[in-house]
A protein has these predicted regions:
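Hydrophobic, well-structured mid-protein blocks that either form specific transmembrane helices
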Residues: 114-156
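Acidic, serine/threonine-rich low-complexity disordered tracts
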Residues: 21-124, 158-265
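Bacterial N-terminal signal peptides
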Residues: 6-16
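Alpha-helical interaction segments
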Residues: 14-15, 75, 140-141
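Compositionally biased, intrinsically disordered low-complexity regions enriched in proline and serine
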Residues: 8, 142, 151-152, 161, ...
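Positively charged n-region of N-terminal signal peptides that target proteins for export
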Residues: 1-4
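Selective for proline/serine-rich intrinsically disordered segments
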Residues: 15-17, 137, 260
Length: 265
């Protein structure tokens, strides 16, 4: 479940030229907005092990006068399974609305007896990450694991050919890692929230980086302007762990990739 929490979200940096007269870049965004909520079932085969959600606050918060999205990602094991392995993971990013880059990041992990609390403040002007574990140099517009996911949703994924690799950078655990995302093609899948046309992508995993090379991760994103995650599949030695979309609300616009709704099946 920890890898699901990491991967669902693990994509992306693409440097765009700064508009004349502007201090920071501007990234067009039709994918998401205030108040969006995405809900998921996390399970193994036919067993539901937990729930997860992405939530954008309905109102902006501000960093140095710049409007920002206040975004949370949470994964929780079912209370009925807490005796076996209790999970309460929470991630937060403060994401610049105009530039789609992070100003702040929090990570609170509770998995069994393991606990970790980490926070970072990104000085995007001076390219530094000031964290609870020290201060580190970063490249321009570096991302955390949550902001990277939202940034990649703004990209025109339909313009990439099958097999193309999007190169990106992500700050994690005291370092900035180079990661790639391979475009695998298109597929139609059915989940609890309906039947969707999707673009399938694969984060390219490197040992010691954001993910461990324990298995393949595949992500299905809706093949429309919203590019919401419909499914995340992680292979493990004994099978596959899946996170599947069960519900959504507050979308920025229509979800044209949905072919059928749950009620029409």
């Amino acid at each position: 479940m920890k890898r699901i929490a990491s991967c669902v979200a693990t994509l992306a940096l693409s440097i765009l030229p700064l508009p004349a007269g502007e201090e920071f870049r501007y990234v067009p965004n039709e994918a998401f907005g205030y108040g969006e909520r995405l809900e998921f079932r996390v399970g193994y085969k036919f067993i539901t092990a937990g729930r997860a959600y992405f939530q954008i606050a309905p109102e902006p918060i501000y960093h140095e006068g710049r409007p920002c999205y206040d975004i949370w990602f949470e994964v929780r094991s079912l209370e009925s399974l807490d005796w076996l392995y209790r999970v309460r993971d929470r991630y937060r990013t403060v994401l610049d609305v105009a530039g789609i880059f992070p100003w702040e990041f929090e990570q609170h992990i509770r998995e069994g007896n393991f606990r970790r609390d980490f926070s970072a403040r990104f000085d995007q002007r001076n390219r530094k990450a000031i964290t609870t574990e020290g201060t580190f140099d970063t490249p321009p517009y570096v991302h955390d694991i949550v902001s990277a996911f939202y940034y990649v949703r703004t990209l025109d994924l339909r313009s990439y050919q099958k097999g193309a690799i999007v190169q990106l950078q992500n700050f994690f655990d005291r370092q900035t890692y180079d990661l790639g995302v391979r475009i695998l093609g298109r597929q139609t899948i059915e989940v609890a929230a309906g039947t969707f046309r999707c673009i399938v992508v694969e984060p390219l995993i490197r040992e010691g980086g954001l993910f461990k090379s324990e298995g393949r991760i595949l992500i299905w994103l809706s093949d429309d302007d919203r590019k919401i995650p419909v499914k995340v599949s992680t292979k493990i030695p004994i099978g596959t762990i899946d996170a599947e979309l069960t519900g959504y609300s507050g979308l920025r616009g229509p979800l044209s990739a949905r072919i059928t709704s749950p009620d029409s099946r």
